[in-house]
Amino acid sequence: VRQELKHELKQGYRDKLVDIREEILRKRRAGKLPGDTASTLKAWWQAHSKWPYPTEEDKARLVQETGLQLKQINNWFINQRKRNWHNN
């Protein structure tokens, strides 16, 4: 009986640790784009730094190149302009 209880406790802790690890990995991924995706967007940004507003065609091409959703592309540019662009 004692061995069974010990085994159940170990299994319970093991399962809980797996759940915690998965949650941490999920949270870490949120908000960060993969490096190659970010570099594609940054390259477009640098090439169009005077007026960083992609056309619908530009956005469609970036969706194809990066695999991101259109909403993610739009949000990236909104955030990038807020953080890094000063229209002088």
Swiss-Prot record:
SUPFAM superfamilies: Homeodomain-like. The keyword DNA-binding applies. Residues 4-24 form the ELK domain. Residues 25-88 bind DNA. GO terms for cellular component: nucleus. Coiled coil: none annotated. PROSITE patterns: ELK (PS51213), HOMEOBOX_1 (PS00027), HOMEOBOX_2 (PS50071). It comes from the Eukaryota. One of its GO terms (molecular function) is DNA binding. Expressed in all tissues examined. Highest expression in leaves. Keywords: DNA-binding, Homeobox, Nucleus. GO terms for biological process: regulation of DNA-templated transcription. Disulfide bonds: none annotated. It is found in: Nucleus. Belongs to the TALE/KNOX homeobox family. This is Homeobox protein knotted-1-like 2. The gene is KNOX2.
